[in-house]
Amino acid sequence: MKQFVLKLYIAGRTQRTEQAISSLKEICEKDLASAYELSVIDVLERPQLAENEKILATPTLVRELPPPLRRVVGDLSNRERVLVGLDLAVRDTFDQEKN
């Protein structure tokens, strides 16, 4: 089973960031089962991490593993957009068409 390592960069704890976290956790539970590790990083509390990773906007979701590195910036409530950004939707669609 593949292990996905995800980092979500947010700016403060607001209703919008809580919604982004909730949406992302829901997508991960449904589509990645337990094969993921999610870290939430507040760029206001840890600006050096954001600078090192060149995070210019929030929310930004970074898939570190498996390679290649992928980023999804902005609205995380759209499941399909997040899965395409993580490079999962195309693979899932292809697998369904084969069966």
Give a label for each model feature.
Residues Q19-S22, E26, Q48, E80, ...:
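Solvent-exposed alpha-helical segments within well-ordered globular domains of core cellular machineries
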Residues E26-E37:
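Conserved helix-turn-beta segment immediately C-terminal to the redox Cys motif
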Residues S39-A57, L88:
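Thioredoxin-like thiol-disulfide oxidoreductase module
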Residues L76-N99:
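Ser/Thr/Gly-rich flexible loops in soluble cytosolic domains mediating phosphotransfer, phosphorylation
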Residues V73:
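Basic, low-complexity intrinsically disordered segments
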